[in-house]
């Protein structure tokens, strides 16, 4: 039943790696060339309404991206034409949370000093408000999302080896009780500030702490959504001196020790 999806995953990886290698030459010739990710874009084909809205959500520190990141975006759009697209940069994330959530939640979010931790929290909040499918900026679908997410799904999470939940793909209806639980746990983690790393403070560690994979709808990542096929750390953070969050968290506290002054 899943053999065709596994084959598709391998073919996508092969194609994506070819484009990634060619992109080194492209950016060697045009080192300053960047492509713009749209703030919003409609679905290419109209699809029937479902509990999980047909919207792909992404975020990044900038909307000006290298060729591999842009190709990753285009691939998702082509593979899932019945889904609209929404994108927010760092400043837009803060504006969204300020406009749609309580001062308590906004102040907690504002204490996060690393972009990846902010993005972890934002994805929960934007899905809780509007619903849809969150994808990391380097994540791509393996199979059309309209087929992966069934009409009966109200939420869907991916698991990796050893049944570990992760958060680079999340599909959810608005007002999801499980997302509410995750949001409360992130709030508690920020308030207590006893966790050193992003992974357990705001990321997949929270999912594995709060949710039981046996009691929620899950799908295996290799037949659903993968990361890093089209792009890599070099192309993602070429314009960010701080580098990837895995390095930044050793230089900057994840949580600001005192709330920012109003």
Feature-to-residue mapping (PLM):
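Small-residue hinge/turn detector
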Residues: 120-131
């Amino acid at each position: 039943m899943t053999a065709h999806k596994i084959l598709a995953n391998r073919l996508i990886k092969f194609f994506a790696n070819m484009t990634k290698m060619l992109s080194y030459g492209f950016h060697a010739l045009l080192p300053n060339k960047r492509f713009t990710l749209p703030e919003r874009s409609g679905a290419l084909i109209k699809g029937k309404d479902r509990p999980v809205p047909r919207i792909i959500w992404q975020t990044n520190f900038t909307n000006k991206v290298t060729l591999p990141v842009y190709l990753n975006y285009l691939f998702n759009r082509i593979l899932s034409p019945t889904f609209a697209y929404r994108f927010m940069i760092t400043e837009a994330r803060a504006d969204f949370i300020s406009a749609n959530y309580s001062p308590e939640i906004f102040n907690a979010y504002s204490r996060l000093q690393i972009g990846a931790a902010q993005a972890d929290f934002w994805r929960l909040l934007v899905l809780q408000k509007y619903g849809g499918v969150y994808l990391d900026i380097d994540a791509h679908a393996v199979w059309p999302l309209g087929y992966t997410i069934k009409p009966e799904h109200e939420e869907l999470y991916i698991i990796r080896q050893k049944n570990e939940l992760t958060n680079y793909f999340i599909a959810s209806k608005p007002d999801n009780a499980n997302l509410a639980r995750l949001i409360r746990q992130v709030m508690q983690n920020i308030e207590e500030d006893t966790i050193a790393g992003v992974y357990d403070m705001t990321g997949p560690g929270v999912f594995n702490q709060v949710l039981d994979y046996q009691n929620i709808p899950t799908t295996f990542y290799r037949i659903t959504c993968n990361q890093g096929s089209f792009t890599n750390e070099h192309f993602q953070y070429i314009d960010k001196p701080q580098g990837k969050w895995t390095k930044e968290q050793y230089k900057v506290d994840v949580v600001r020790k005192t709330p920012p002054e109003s």
